[in-house]
């Protein structure tokens, strides 16, 4: 299992969406898992805002636990 680099990682909108889909969650479901609002997930995915601080770290931890790795531009099989 590839480790996700936590420190200094900046999550982009398409990565957040890919992680959510990898987990099989809706925006509401991911928001519940992270303790945030569905609107926040939507804003991250559309690029209006980027996750910062604790949210950034939580996304990396969830990704690592789920065995998720992603490169920009990657398509789902």
Write out the residue ranges for each language-model feature.
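Residue-level detection of the helix-turn-helix DNA-binding "recognition helix"
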Residues: 21, 35, 46, 64
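Key DNA-contacting residues within the recognition helix of helix-turn-helix
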Residues: 17, 42-43, 52, 60
């Amino acid at each position: 299992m590839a480790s996700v680099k936590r420190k200094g990682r900046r999550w982009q909108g398409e990565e957040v969406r890919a992680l959510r889909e990898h987990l099989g969650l809706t925006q509401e479901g991911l928001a519940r898992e992270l303790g945030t609002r569905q609107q926040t997930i939507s804003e991250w995915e559309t690029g209006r805002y980027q996750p910062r601080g604790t949210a950034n770290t939580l996304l990396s931890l969830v990704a690592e636990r789920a065995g998720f790795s992603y490169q920009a531009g990657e398509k789902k099989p």
